[in-house]
């Protein structure tokens, strides 16, 4: 796990009734890119238990450079995903980068 050093938090505000459709699109997207994006280590989708219009998408990265390259304006696959799901958004996602200081999953 020590090769996961950075995380991008994507806070998504969805229109009413769009969560299931958006989650399906996100899962399909990640299934297609896994193993094909340098430095990409995985993702997690979190659905807010109290607010059905909020979803968090966390992406995990080997390096900040890998993460920044992926989230650049020149990434057409990400741009295409955003264009496809944009009608489901209440507003554009908020993106925040984090340095992972400690990451442990108990076995």
What are these regions (language model features)?
Residues 19-21, 54, 66-68, 104-107:
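Intrinsically disordered, low-complexity acidic/polar segments
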Residues 1, 7-9, 24, 74, ...:
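Generic cytosolic/nucleocytoplasmic N-terminal low-complexity/intrinsically disordered segments
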Residues 6-13, 42-73:
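Short, well-ordered beta-strand segments in beta-rich or mixed alpha/beta enzyme
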Residues 14-16, 63, 99-102:
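Non-catalytic surface loops within mature trypsin-like serine protease
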Residues 28, 32-40, 60-96:
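An amphipathic, aromatic/His-enriched active-site/gating alpha helix that lines ligand/cofactor pockets
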Residues 13-26:
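Short, surface-exposed ligand-recognition loops at beta-strand->loop->(often short) alpha-helix junctions
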Residues 1-4, 44-53, 81-107:
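Glycine-rich beta-strand-turn "strand-cap" elements at beta-sheet edges
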């Amino acid at each position: 796990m020590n090769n996961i050093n950075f995380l991008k938090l994507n806070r998504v505000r969805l229109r009413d009734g769009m969560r299931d459709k958006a989650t399906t699109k996100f899962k399909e997207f990640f299934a297609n890119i896994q193993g094909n994006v340098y430095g990409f280590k995985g993702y997690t989708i979190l659905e807010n238990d109290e607010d059905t219009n909020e979803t968090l998408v966390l992406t995990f990265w080997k390096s900040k450079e890998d993460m920044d390259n992926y989230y650049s304006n020149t990434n057409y696959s990400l741009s295409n995903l955003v264009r496809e799901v944009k009608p489901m958004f209440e507003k554009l996602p908020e993106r925040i980068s984090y340095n992972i200081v400690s990451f442990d999953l108990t076995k």
